[in-house]
Amino acid sequence: MKICSVSIFAIGAVTFAANAGFINPLTPTWRGTADTEYMGWENFTSAYGGSNLPDVPNSNNLGALINFGPGAVLTSTKNIYSPTGPLFISMAGGMTAAPRNPLEVVLNISAAGTVINMQSVTLSLMDNFGSLIRVNPIASIVRFDEPFQMGGRVQTLAFTWNFQPNLIAATQWQVNFSSTGANTSLDAVSLDMRFIPAPGALSVLAMLGGGGMICGRRRRL
């Protein structure tokens, strides 16, 4: 877990300390197996307008995360903190061996302070012919929640999507979400996708009974 602080010079110096991190995230059992993608962000490099590439070990490089909420800054531990307005996060990327149809998608968000707007979370799938499918998650889950000493909450949120096979020959994806106001510190994000397996693997997948979910707890320091 990251403990972070940042000084904001406005009317005076304000110290923001966040005790955040993934606590009890929703981790798919199929992460790291064939026909899956995983991306994780824990140390951001751009607070506003720049691409943040996945930095967690075993992430692929097929996506980037950008904050379009002006006024945000990086904290000492590489969180994205917004002292003046909401965060507006857009994540976008491509598919391995595109076009590919995802079957399951799992998103985890860790933040402290002003909470993430759970109604703002959407996933879009695009093909090369201008078609677009934008859907809300089928499940939005508060995996961890406790009061934050400076106001607001410390939360780990999870969102899931399920898709029918051959819904769209997707070559690109995009995930959007925002916070409900100023003073949000975005600590970590993860995204998992499971795709239609290769024909030779379908019988094996059927024998195994498909995928499932497990949950873990990140050690708090």
For each feature predicted by the language model, list its residue ranges.
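Sec/Tat signal peptide C-region and signal peptidase I cleavage site
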Residues: 14-20
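N-terminal targeting leaders for non-cytosolic proteins
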Residues: 21-83
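Short beta-strands within extracellular/lumenal beta-sheet-rich domains
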Residues: 76-101
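A short beta-strand element within beta-rich, extracytoplasmic domains
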Residues: 99-114
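Short, surface-exposed beta-strand/strand-loop-strand elements in extracellular ectodomains
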Residues: 117-130
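Extracellular carbohydrate recognition and processing domains
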Residues: 130-163
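Short beta-strand-plus-loop segments that form exposed binding edges in beta-rich domains
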Residues: 174-183
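A short, hydrophobic C-terminal helix/tail in secreted or cell-surface proteins
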Residues: 198-216
